[in-house]
From Swiss-Prot:
Keywords, in A-Z order: Molybdenum cofactor biosynthesis, Transferase
Family: Belongs to the MoaE family.
Alphabetized CDD domains for the sequence: MoaE (cd00756)
Gene: moaE
Name of the featured protein: Molybdopterin synthase catalytic subunit
GO cellular component, one term: cytosol
Length: 150
């Protein structure tokens, strides 16, 4: 299996990542998820987001999550890109993409990777609103989503 992980400040091209995931004739299914900066959270207008990470440890954690997905499903390619730094409302934050021979494996693996990324990868998120800024923790619903895979 081919999996690539990137933690970067730069934006990414969903089209380019899709092309890389879809290469070859074995991939009968390609599933992608793109997370974006919302303009509203907890009743407040969000104007931006600041993301920090633990260099080296974050990439290792993401690779481990990809390996766990590979152990559960027959995947051909996995791509995880997570941005750091300052972003504005509407900007792309994260891409998770997987290819597999079958759609069920591709859908499940993509969801698994995103659920584990939200709860296990060392990222810190500060939300900037029109009134103030605040650090955002993982939500209970994120942990519940990850627990269903255990």
């Amino acid at each position: 299996m081919d999996h690539r992980v990137s933690v970067q400040k730069e934006d990414f091209s969903v089209a380019q990542e899709y092309e890389a995931l879809a290469q070859g004739s074995q991939a009968g299914a390609v599933v992608t998820f793109v997370g974006k900066v919302r303009d509203m959270n907890l009743g407040d207008n969000v104007v931006g987001l600041h993301l920090e990470h633990y260099p080296g440890m974050t990439e290792k954690s993401l690779l481990e999550i990809c390996d766990m997905a590979q152990e559960r499903w027959p995947l051909q390619r996995v791509r995880v890109i997570h941005r750091i730094g300052d972003m504005l409302s509407g900007d792309q934050i994260v891409l998770v993409g997987v290819s597999s021979a079958h759609r069920n494996a591709a859908f499940a693996a993509c969801e698994f990777i995103m659920d584990y990324l939200k709860t296990r990868a060392p990222f810190w998120k500060k939300e900037l609103t029109t009134e103030a800024s605040r650090w955002i923790d993982s939500r209970d619903s994120d942990h519940q989503a990850a627990q269903r895979w255990e």
